[in-house]
Amino acid sequence: MSNTNTTKAKVDMLNGPLFMKILIFALPLAASSLLQQLFNSVDVAVVGRFASSKALAAVGSNAPVISLLINLFIGISMGANVVISNHLGQRDEQSIRHAICTVTLIAAISGLLLMCIGIGVARPILELMDTPSDVLDMAVLYLRIYFIGIPFFLIFNFGAAILRSVGDTRRPLYILVVAGIINTVLNLIFVIGLGMSVEGVAIATAVANAISAAWIIQLLRKEPGAIQLQFKHLRIYKKELKRMLQIGVPAGLQGMVFSISNVVVQSAINGYGAAAIAGSAAAVNFEYYCYYIIVACNGAAISFIGQNYGAQKYDRVRRIYRICLLMGLIGCFIANTLFTWQNQFFLSFFTTDAEVIHYGAIRMEGVLLFQFIACSYEVTGSALRGMGESMLPTIMTVFGTCILRIIWVFAVLPHYTGFAHLLQVYPLSWILTGAMVIIAYKLKMRQICPK
């Protein structure tokens, strides 16, 4: 790609009107996240329609485990985004180069470490979650093959974080479009053409991740200016690493604890049988689709606020937060309502089993319909992280969301055993966490920008 096209892909975050720039930044980011989720959704849909409901349950039961193991490293990539954005706002080119080198090596090392951990703990953690015996072996096989491709997944996500820090969300989207098409074609070949099951969709996902990683590394090597990746200069710079970890580790730990609570909830879901697992696995895809609207607003908040906070443009920081929050609330509410309204239709893409669809509809009506409330703490927490405040939203989210869900499963659910009662904890935890994080944001803004 030429330097001219590279420049056009970037967004000036420090000057001019904000709404359209944030929208232009956020839309490709939302589409990129949706395409990544489509990798998993295609896996779920193909095995659900062309293999079996048990294969669908095997793939779906792995989602909380995968999130648990990768969230720490995704948090560190968020820290890299903030650090690079701050340096861009300060126009510190040497620090930008050091950060690029550091984050690239961290991605490669983390990916290899996570691959080994994931392969090793696949069976023990699924057994700990009370995964039914009739789906356990398939779930273990899927998870182990999936983690063979996890180094490529992390390299792509860290590389995309670098491009997002300079306002470029379009080129990662182009990569994911191609990788998503390849993933879909390989799924159909392996499952329908070759008669494979969960192993086929796992291999297809790993191949798609490898293509994405190779492509984004090539883009970064050809970048002009300070964000160009030069292999001969690769090393870890302690100053940049320390700052990335200060911001990224709390965010990653939040994600891990969040996932632990979801693993506990998934374990409770497993107690309702294979149909409930499969129905929940199908329904959760639509939660992810809607959640990635929030993720796009999170990414915009981190990058825009990161640069403007670094440049000490605090009035713009306040306006950026409000725009991102409103975009997330409105966009997520519309998507939540649409999917829930036609839940039978959308669930039929994943399965034709009436009992599975029944459980999926219960989840959509009890969780998905209220998901827009999560914007209150997600976008606000991202705004705080863009200003370098990572620990506070982490602590509040851990208490307001994660601990409440665990308490609910062990203290409340034994007295109200219905599947719908289990799911009520989601909107309750979002309301509590949102209230706490918004108060923290207001206190931070009074500190840096007193009226």
Give the location of each predicted region.
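Short alpha-helical transmembrane segments in multi-pass integral membrane proteins
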Residues: M1-A26, I84-G149, I182, G193-V249, ...
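Residue-level signal for transmembrane alpha-helical positions in Major Facilitator Superfamily
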Residues: L23, L27, F39, I76, ...
